[in-house]
Amino acid sequence: EIVPRDWSSDVCSSDLPGFCEGSAWQFTWYVPHDVKGLINLIGERQFIDRLNAGFATSEKVSFNALGDNMGAYPINHGNETNMQAAYLFSYTSKPWHTQKWARAIQEKYYGMGPRDAYPGDEDQGQMSSWYILSSIGLFQMDGGCSKDPVWLLGSPRFDRVEIQLDNTYYSGKKLIIKAENVSKDNCYIQSVRFNNKRLSNN
């Protein structure tokens, strides 16, 4: 018999049985092909509150579950099921949570110590790619698989980044990202312009 859970009740979602390298809580957020559908299903306010609570809990352990404890904490950045999690807020009315948590992961998860750098799943350069893209303020939820890719905006760590574009795929020669007042603590975007046109909030 299969009985749907009442998601308003307290469910022990960190149990691993039935899940490979993750938990029910973590896999709940892994719907990269239909994030808006997931938000509608959960409800935006609950979506934001639950995800924020998961990040706050996992920040205490630097978003890192070592060894075989992949499902022990809500957000385990070193595993595929959670690498997109910080950018899920970009699909809500409060995208600044993306900027906060993506920057927190860069500051706390990555580093030079034995628990830092690549303690997680570095398949095909995944960890380093996430860091590089996030540090220039970009991310793709679908991992570059879409015919018409959508780039999500994070918080650049550099005041200027210049990317040479391959004319086989792009009409322009380069993409230049400029950010004002860049600092370690200043991670919140106030406005964005693309080709001198102001973009909407999300």
Label the model's feature ranges.
Residues 1-11:
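Single conserved hydrophobic/aromatic residue that forms the stacking wall/gate
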Residues 1, 23, 73, 120:
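Conserved short-loop catalytic and cofactor-binding motifs
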Residues 10, 41, 45, 52-63, ...:
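Non-catalytic C-terminal accessory modules of carbohydrate-active enzymes
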Residues 9-42, 75-76:
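Extended ligand-binding clefts on enzyme/binding-domain cores
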Residues 12-21, 32, 65-70, 81-82, ...:
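Flexible glycine/proline-enriched surface loops and loop-helix/loop-strand junctions
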Residues 1-3, 28, 182:
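Short, flexible, glycine/charge-rich loop motifs used to bind or transfer phosphoryl groups or to couple energy/partner
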Residues 33, 47-50:
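N-terminal hydrophobic targeting segments
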